[in-house]
From Swiss-Prot:
<dbReference type="InterPro" id="IPR016180">
    <property type="entry name" value="Ribosomal_uL16_dom"/>
</dbReference>
<keyword id="KW-0820">tRNA-binding</keyword>
<dbReference type="GO" id="GO:0022625">
    <property type="term" value="C:cytosolic large ribosomal subunit"/>
</dbReference>
<keyword id="KW-0687">Ribonucleoprotein</keyword>
<dbReference type="GO" id="GO:0019843">
    <property type="term" value="F:rRNA binding"/>
</dbReference>
<keyword id="KW-0689">Ribosomal protein</keyword>
<dbReference type="InterPro" id="IPR020798">
    <property type="entry name" value="Ribosomal_uL16_CS"/>
</dbReference>
<dbReference type="Pfam" id="PF00252">
    <property type="entry name" value="Ribosomal_L16"/>
</dbReference>
<protein>
    <recommendedName>
        <fullName>Large ribosomal subunit protein uL16</fullName>
    </recommendedName>
</protein>
<keyword id="KW-0699">rRNA-binding</keyword>
<keyword id="KW-0694">RNA-binding</keyword>
<dbReference type="InterPro" id="IPR000114">
    <property type="entry name" value="Ribosomal_uL16_bact-type"/>
</dbReference>
<dbReference type="GO" id="GO:0003735">
    <property type="term" value="F:structural constituent of ribosome"/>
</dbReference>
<dbReference type="GO" id="GO:0006412">
    <property type="term" value="P:translation"/>
</dbReference>
<comment type="similarity">
    <text>Belongs to the universal ribosomal protein uL16 family.</text>
</comment>
<comment type="subunit">
    <text>Part of the 50S ribosomal subunit.</text>
</comment>
<dbReference type="InterPro" id="IPR036920">
    <property type="entry name" value="Ribosomal_uL16_sf"/>
</dbReference>
Amino acid sequence: MLQPKKTKFRKAFKGRIHGNAKGGTSLNFGSYGLKAMEPERITARQIEAARRAISRAIKRQGRLWIRIFPDVPVSSKPAEVRMGKGKGSPEYWAARVKPGRILFELDGVPGPVAALAFERAAMKLPIKTKVIARLGDTSHLEG
């Protein structure tokens, strides 16, 4: 699973995800992409599950790019522990995703295969997503 090698701080504020994505909103590598339509924290496990779903759907052909990285440590307190006594220890890593952000990109596969792969990946993610194509026309994805 993805996680940073080294961080400046061990724990992070919870924070809120405001506004739309400024960068990472257009296809840079592949012909097809999966775009986030809602703000949410996506965990490293969810990213890995979506990556596996895409890899299985495309049957090891084409190329996949992961455009998000889990760089926020999410801490939680153990079960049945009273409030106070400091913040819990970091449990997992997450990526803060804003609407409009490209999550995954695919190239070297036909449109219908890419659409199927992204639909399967979307089921593993906690947000609404949209399949986009470099041509801007997604009518050939339904074929």
